[in-house]
Amino acid sequence: TGESYAGHYIPALASRIHQGNQANEGIHINLKGLAIGNGLTNPAIQYKGYPDYALDMGIITQTTHDLLGKVLVPACELAIKLCGTNGKVSCLTANVACNLIFSDIMLHAGGVNYYDIRKKCEGSLCYDFSNMEKFLNQESVRDSLGVGKIRFVSCSTEVYMAMLVDWMRNLEVGIPLLLEDGINLLIYAGEYDLICNWLGNSRWVHAMKWSGQKEFVASSDVPFVVNGSQAGLLKSYGPLSFLKVHDAGHMVPMDQPKAALEMVKQWTRGTLAESIDGEEKLVADM
């Protein structure tokens, strides 16, 4: 499980583990499921969704939305297609072309926190993580973690630059095989995150080709209730679940810790979808 760029490395890691298990490579890893929160998985779909989300949330005007859709979105889509066939340089080009969409939206957003549009951006990362950095860089903590003298930073420029080639690649492609073999997938997203917003995530999940796609698309959204209050909207069929989390931004566990914990507990126990079954039974009985 992971969030944000985990939308890339969680599917890749899960696919590799599953492949190794199928081929009896080394020690069998008992992979049961994977979960991604506000992730970037299918850039072609998610970047195209930026203008729609920004318009829906009142960040940009209809005029700006339409201009983005006519000029920058088609250029992004073409660049991503080339990235998928021509390797490294074209993927860097796609990164530049597609992030013009995001940059243009931010230009109109007026200093909004792109991880939580209800807030203003503070510092280079839009959040103050200085206390976390101080804690993790204590010598006693580094010794406990076994990382030696490596200094922790919230965002490593070196790692960021190394991953630019990978950024615009579609990591959804390995997921259908996992679903077909009964490995569970939970995609969840806080509703106020812009950068990896719930709308783009919902769209790639709905567009994904697998044997249960038709049934998943046709299934209804039902309330995800925590302590008697609606904490989100849940959609599920078979091994696939999608949860839009209310009153949360990019970092759901930070914004809604109780809801996040309950989500993970129910999902790992296999009971997250039971609320959907109960809702459908209630409708049928009526």
UniProtKB/Swiss-Prot annotation:
The record's comment on protein family reads: Belongs to the peptidase S10 family.
EC id = 3.4.16.-
PROSITE patterns per the UniProt record, alphabetical: CARBOXYPEPT_SER_HIS (PS00560)
Q: Name one GO cellular component term.
A: vacuole
Disulphide linkage map: 83-98, 121-126
Residues listed as glycosylation sites in the UniProt record? 227
Q: Which GO terms describe its biological process?
A: proteolysis
Q: Which residues form a coiled coil?
A: none
Protein name (database record): Serine carboxypeptidase-like
The cross-references to PANTHER family, in alphabetical order and at most eight, read: SERINE CARBOXYPEPTIDASE CTSA-4.1, SERINE PROTEASE FAMILY S10 SERINE CARBOXYPEPTIDASE
GO molecular function: any one? Answer: serine-type carboxypeptidase activity
Identify which residues the record assigns to the active site.
4, 193, 250
